[in-house]
Amino acid sequence: MVSDELWKDNFDLASCCLEHPFVRGIADGSLEGQKFAYYVGQDAFFLESFARAYSIAAAKSPDFSVFTTFHNLAGGVLEELQLHQGYAREWNVDLKVQQPGNATRRYTDFLLVTAWSGDIGLIASAMSPCMALYAFFGTELSKNCIP
C-alpha cells in the first residue's frame, strides 16, 4: 500500500516529532503554561477547520456509506474540540479572539482549499498525515503509561 510505504519512508520524521520537547512536555505535563495555552488556541482553530474539511468531504460523498464515515469523523473532531474548549476555559484562553499563527493558518488554508476544490480521495489524502501522526503519538506515549 502506498500509505504504508510513505509511512516507512518517513518514520524517522515521525520519531523526531515524538521526541520534540513540545510533544514530550505535553505528554509529561512539563510544558510551560503559556505555551500550553497558545497550543490550545491554535489546536482549537485547527480542529474547527479539520471538522469543516470532513464535513465538506461528507457533502461530496458519492453514497450514504461514505457520507456516514466522513460525518462520523467530523463528529469525533467536534468532540475533541469540546475538550479543547474546556481547556480554554481552564487556562483563560478566549477562543473567539484567538488568531491562528502562520503555520496554523497555512495548514488550515491548505486543508480547506483542498476540501473545496478536490474530490473526497484528495481530501482524505490531505488529512491523513495528521491523523497518522497523532495516532502514532498516542500509541507510543501510551506504552509509557502516558494517557
Q: Where on the chain are the PLM-derived regions?
A:
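Short, charged/polar, low-complexity loop and linker segments
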Residues: F22-D28, L111-V113
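Alpha-helical bundle segments that constitute or directly flank the non-heme di-iron/ferroxidase center
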Residues: F11-C16, S30-K60, E79, S125-A135
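A ubiquitous short alpha-helical element
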Residues: E5-K8, K35-Q42, N92-V97, L122-I123
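Short, flexible helix-adjacent loops and helix caps
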Residues: A27, L31, S55-D63, W116, ...
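A generic alpha-helix surface/boundary motif
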Residues: P21, A51-R52, Q82, R105
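Active-site-proximal alpha-helical scaffolds that flank and shape metal-associated catalytic sites
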Residues: S65-P147
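Acidic, low-complexity proline/glycine-rich segments
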Residues: M1-V23
